């Protein structure tokens, strides 16, 4: 499986450092980074977006943000994103039952291991990741009751960042990179 287009044969010198960082962080020469070299402004802005997204905050731990990333990947049905964001499920302590709920195979509310805040973050991510966007007032009331303004912005920007990558990966036909050893897409 390959992308719709090939990477450029020559990469501008100022993007080579970013490609080196990507390889150092992921252990791979990622196709998305190489394809973005066709339009250096997109490569630079995408790199900045990726570098500045929250991976933990004082009240939003790594697990909650991981759940948001994985849920956004699954809702957008992006194979590359699912592969990238599910590789460390065990580090984030995502159980098989929780994964089934994220995949939509079981109800999130029925999973006792999700905290109230995690359930709300998952639902918020689903709402952010669907088209058309719709945020029921009753849900927003619950959200603002359980999260600070800062936390809501971090949840929204994390989900939006994954959605950016999901649409970009799919628009360029980028296949999974092989980070995880199994497909996390729910069965058809």
Predicted feature locations:
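Acidic/histidine-rich alpha-helical segments that form the ligand environment
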Residues: 113-156
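Iron-sulfur (Fe-S) cluster-binding segments and ferredoxin-like electron-carrier domains
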Residues: 41-44, 82-101
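N-terminal hydrophobic signal/anchor transmembrane helix of membrane proteins
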Residues: 66-86, 100, 105, 153-170
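Acidic/His metal-coordination segments adjacent to aromatic residues that form catalytic metal sites
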Residues: 102-116
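Amphipathic alpha-helical hairpins
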Residues: 59, 63-67
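Short acidic alpha-helix initiation/capping motifs at coil-to-helix transition points
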Residues: 41-47, 77-81, 120, 129-137, ...
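Mobile cap/lid helix-loop segments that border enzyme active or cofactor-binding sites
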Residues: 1-60, 186-188
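Preference for long, well-ordered alpha-helical segments
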Residues: 142, 149-188
């Amino acid at each position: 499986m390959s992308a719709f287009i090939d990477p450029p044969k020559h990469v501008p010198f100022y993007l080579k450092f970013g490609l080196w960082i990507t390889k150092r962080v992921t252990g791979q020469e990622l196709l998305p980074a190489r394809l973005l070299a066709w339009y250096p402004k997109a490569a630079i802005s995408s790199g900045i977006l990726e570098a500045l997204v929250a991976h933990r905050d004082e009240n939003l731990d790594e697990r909650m943000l991981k759940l948001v990333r994985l849920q956004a990947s699954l809702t957008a049905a992006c194979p590359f994103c699912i592969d990238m964001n599910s590789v460390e499920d065990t580090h984030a302590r995502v159980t098989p039952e929780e994964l089934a709920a994220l995949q939509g195979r079981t109800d999130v509310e029925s999973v006792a291991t999700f905290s109230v805040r995690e359930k709300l973050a998952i639902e918020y991510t689903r709402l952010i990741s669907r088209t058309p966007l719709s945020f029921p007032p009753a849900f927003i009331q619950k959200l603002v009751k359980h999260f600070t303004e800062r936390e809501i912005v971090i949840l929204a920007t994390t989900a939006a960042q994954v959605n950016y990558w999901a649409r970009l990966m799919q628009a360029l036909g980028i296949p999974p990179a092989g980070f995880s050893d199994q497909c996390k897409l729910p069965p058809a």
